[in-house]
Design a protein with these regions (language model features):
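Membrane-embedded alpha-helical segments that form the functional core of polytopic membrane enzymes
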Residues: 20-62, 97-98, 102, 106-122, ...
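Transmembrane alpha-helical core residues of multi-pass small-molecule transporters
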Residues: 22, 47, 93, 114-118, ...
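Proline-centered turn/helix-capping motifs that create local helix->coil transitions or kinks
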Residues: 16, 58, 62-66, 184
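Intramembrane alpha-helical segments
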Residues: 2-10, 75-156, 161
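Small-residue-rich segments of transmembrane alpha-helices in multi-pass membrane proteins
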Residues: 18-26, 77, 135-152, 194-196, ...
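Multi-pass membrane catalytic core of lipid/isoprenoid biosynthesis enzymes
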Residues: 46-47, 64-112, 190-226
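Short helix-capping/hinge motifs at transmembrane helix termini and TM-loop junctions
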Residues: 30-34, 104-106, 126-127, 152-153, ...
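C-terminal membrane-associated helical module and adjoining short loops/tails
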Residues: 2-9, 14-17, 94, 124, ...
Length: 277
């Protein structure tokens, strides 16, 4: 396996493309089409992608032993890339991403620094705690969309809604991934929700999260500003209903893996739905 191929797999290249797409769609469709060719948007997206890539690397660095049980075929560190080079790439990507943020403005620079630190802390400790690790990743994902509005104020309700969407669907996906990785996590003493609560209660919690998202959007529609609620019904809510129906029947590792991939499809569909608003 070549070094380049190993790096692309280690940094989840396709996930990084989705992050960039989300930020460009947010800027172009929810804020202003004039932002698409703005160099500041390119720099913001680049810094976000670099920090996310660094996060994937450090996560795999700390998870090598667990991954050898849960997904041995996907382990890169120690095979395609040495642990020393993995740490080097993580540091370079993190520092570059934070530096680009400060070039844009101090608020984005500080946000990027906090994100880079939280990704390291998540990989080192938080992901082994019930709920806290899931919450951290979900907040960072929602922030990757919201930060576009920090670059291009004033604050917009639709950007906030899609940030919430990214937050909740990521939270659910992270919990489903914990269900998928139950055996390896338990072996190494991780205290994820499925281990602490059991599969049934963990599933119930994911249903609650999805229902809470729908209730929050309905509340905003009634109390804040009129929203395209019918559009959201089929573009955001309907896929979530399908997710719940599938999750109810899921009970094998393969089922949870497929559900995790379906969450990525829902996320991508949600991002693309911005183009139709």
């Amino acid at each position: 396996m070549s070094l380049l191929n190993s790096l692309l797999r280690l940094t989840r290249f396709w996930n990084l493309l989705i992050i960039g797409l989300a930020q460009y769609c947010t800027a172009g469709f929810l804020i202003s089409t004039e932002t698409i060719f703005d160099i500041r948007l390119f720099l913001l997206s680049s810094s976000t992608i670099l920090i996310a890539a660094a996060g994937y690397i450090i996560n795999d660095y700390y998870d090598v032993k667990i991954d050898l049980i849960n997904k041995p075929e996907r382990v890169i560190i120690g095979k395609g890339i040495t642990r020393r080079y993995a740490l080097l790439f993580h540091t370079l990507l993190s520092v570059t991403g934070v530096a680009i943020g400060f070039l844009l403005n101090w608020k984005i620079g500080v946000a990027n620094f906090i994100c880079a630190f939280l990704l390291w802390l998540y990989s080192n400790a938080l992901k082994r705690l019930p709920f806290i690790g899931n919450l951290t990743v979900a907040v960072l994902t929602g922030l990757s969309i919201f930060i576009v509005n920090v670059l291009y104020p004033p604050m917009m309700v639709l950007v906030g809604i899609y940030s919430l969407f990214a937050f909740f669907i990521t939270m659910v996906r992270e919990i489903i991934k914990d269900l998928e990785d139950l055996r390896g996590d338990d072996t190494f003493g991780c205290k994820t929700l499925p281990i602490v609560w059991g599969i049934r209660r963990t599933k119930l919690f994911t249903y609650f999260l999805l229902a809470l998202f729908a209730l929050m959007i309905t509340f905003l529609h009634q109390r804040s500003a009129p929203l395209p609620i019918n559009f959201f019904a089929w573009s955001l809510f309907l896929p979530m209903v399908a997710l719940v129906g599938w999750l109810v029947r899921a009970d094998t590792r393969k089922d949870f893996y497929q559900l995790s991939q379906f969450c990525k499809v829902i996320m991508l569909a949600g991002i693309l739905s911005m183009a139709f608003l």
